[in-house]
Amino acid sequence: MNENREQVLKNVKRVLIKIGSAVLTGDNGLDLERIQHLVDQMAALTHRGYQVVMVTSGAIASGKHRLGITTALKSIPQKQAAAAIGQGRLMRIYSNSFGKHGLYVGQILLTMSDLTDRRRFLNIRNTLSTLMEWGIIAIINENDTVAIDEIKFGDNDNLAAMIANIIEAHLVINLTSTPGLYDRNPASSRNARLIPLVREITEDIEAAASEEGTSVGTGGMKSKVMAAKKVTAFGIPYIIAPGKQKDVLLDIFDGNELGTLFLPMREHLSSRKYWIAFTLRSRGVLSIDAGARTAILEEGKSLLPSGIVGVEGDFIVGDPVTCVDRDGVPLAKGLVNYSAPDIRKIMGLKTSRIEQVLGHKDYDEIIHRDNLAVIRRSRRHREAG
């Protein structure tokens, strides 16, 4: 067994498995034989003592097949109607398939707004925790029938990354239609080589990911690598693996080197800071100077008004805001203690002048370090890791 894989697998108790539409479907709609084979493997893992949580695509594809639609659906109402028809059928298939192994399933449909609200986020965590305690296979999907752009996850790769944080998974496996991440697009280059191990998601790794989505899903390799970036930032290893390969899940847990393994960051975010960084949508931007950049990235300090050189947006107190350097590179995201109009008045000033300018001083910091999540490590930290 590869040393990195052995180290990863020996600590795994709870695994999140994401299955894409391209894996679940064939030429004639849902591939029932493949679904049963995947379920057989997940059931085997469950009986071995692993806690298995699923994020599944396939509702729209299932609905299209039920209706005999072979062309792409273009309008949102059409996609939502197809999802309404297909989701029930998809769950029935999963329920029957897991039932053959004496296992029950529980359905959870989510939109982004369910996770950005901290109370609902924690309620979802409690529900999933209870399902796992009861030995129920939680099956999660985006609620396509009601989701609009403002509350969509974008794709289920992103949804899976967020669920990994909620359940505090020990491993995420993303089953896709390709063998893993290549150093270049294999569809256009004969010299493309599979990358078996990624220690850090660099710009070169991001560039290697294809921008193209699949014919039946919304997420391409770029989406999967971005999800890997989020998951590994929380300290969770991430594997992109060929979902159509026989016994792929069992082979992974037996230590076989399948797909691409992304190692977790050594210095990772807490659950709450992960929620701030990757679940909340930014309401504005604060541009900061070199001194503030160093204080945040290398010293773990709060953001003070003296380090701010620019403000974008019309946010209010408590909103999530992205901190960028002078070149516009995102560095951190945090919850602000002052509104955008107030920050414009006090940016560049010392803390001692806040009350003089605003007439009040509720906080010394624009963003306290407890509410500030670093999303880009300093070069010193990367080299140390």
Swiss-Prot record:
PROSITE patterns reported in the protein's UniProt record: GLUTAMATE_5_KINASE (PS00902), PUA (PS50890)
Binding site for substrate: 57, 144, 156
Keyword Disulfide bond: no
Catalytic activity of the protein: L-glutamate + ATP = L-glutamyl 5-phosphate + ADP
Key word Kinase present: yes
Subcellular locations according to the entry: Cytoplasm
Domain PUA: 283-361
Positions with a binding annotation for ATP: 18, 218-224
EC number(s) on file: 2.7.2.11
Pathway: Amino-acid biosynthesis; L-proline biosynthesis; L-glutamate 5-semialdehyde from L-glutamate: step 1/2
UniProt keyword list: Amino-acid biosynthesis, ATP-binding, Cytoplasm, Kinase, Nucleotide-binding, Proline biosynthesis, Transferase
Superkingdom: Bacteria
One Pfam family named in its UniProt record: AA_kinase
GO molecular function: ATP binding; glutamate 5-kinase activity; RNA binding
HAMAP family cross-referenced by the UniProt entry: ProB
Protein name (database record): Glutamate 5-kinase
Organism: Syntrophus aciditrophicus (strain SB)
Highest classification ranks of the organism: Bacteria, Pseudomonadati, Thermodesulfobacteriota, Syntrophia, Syntrophales
